[in-house]
Structures are given as C-alpha cells and as structure tokens.
Amino acid sequence: AMPNMMDRMADALASRGVTSAWVVHGHGGLDELAVSGPNTVFELHDGQVHTFEVNAKDFGIAVSTLDDIRGGEPEDNLAILRDTFAGKPGPVRDIVTFNAGCALYVAGIAGDVSDGIERARASIDSGAAVAVLENVIAITHREATRMETQP
C-alpha cells in the first residue's frame, strides 16, 4: 500500500468488520513484504491498529535485492513459481515463504511469524503448495474456456 494510505486502509478494513489484517508497504515500494529491507506494517487486530516494522532478516531470511525477485513475461513467471514450489532455493522462495508465513500468522493459523514461515516451507517441501498451484491453474483454464464458449 502507499504509505500515505495505510492508516485509511486499515480503518476501512476495521469498519467492514475485519478483525485481523496487515496493511503493508514493502521495502523498495513493494505492495507486499520485501526481503530487501524493513517493511512498514499497520496491523489491525480486534479493532486496534498498531504500526511496526518487520524485516525478513530477523527471521533468518537472506537479504535480496528487488532485481533478485523481478519476474518477466507471464510464462516466465509461471516457470519461476513452479521451480519455487518444486523446492528451488533462493530469493523467490524466500519472499514467498516470508509473505505466506506472515499471512498464516495474520489468519490465526500459525502462532507467530516464525511458525508461519516454517509452515510455508513445509508446504513447499511436501509438495502441497505445487498441488494447490496446479489446481488453481486448472480451474482458471476451465473457467476461461467456459466463459469463451458462453453466448
């Protein structure tokens, strides 16, 4: 999120009945948590908003540059994601597990961010993440075909 909009976004979520959320501004201007430096977080929890910074390096994740995670054409990005979900180590896996780990914490599935990161890594290592990815791809293709054939 844009830094000057984060408080309004958190307030809007609270007004809509959301009880747990993070509105983030990633290092380098990302709209997700970055592994390149500190990230600003507005945390909504039970109607209260708290602001803090979270840094991937504090969870043992190597610092990487934005160029290390930059994608390209959709086909290239899918190949990168498939490699990542197949267990390929590196900056893309790091940013995926960091964001997923934080999301698992915010959703109440993980007890803390470290636990969430470990769960995300386990999902990749077990093959569960790639199974979900392939299912999403299949559903997307099926729905696109269905929409193309409708009058």
Report residues per predicted region:
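Glycine-rich anion-binding loops and their surrounding alpha/beta cores
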Residues: 1-151
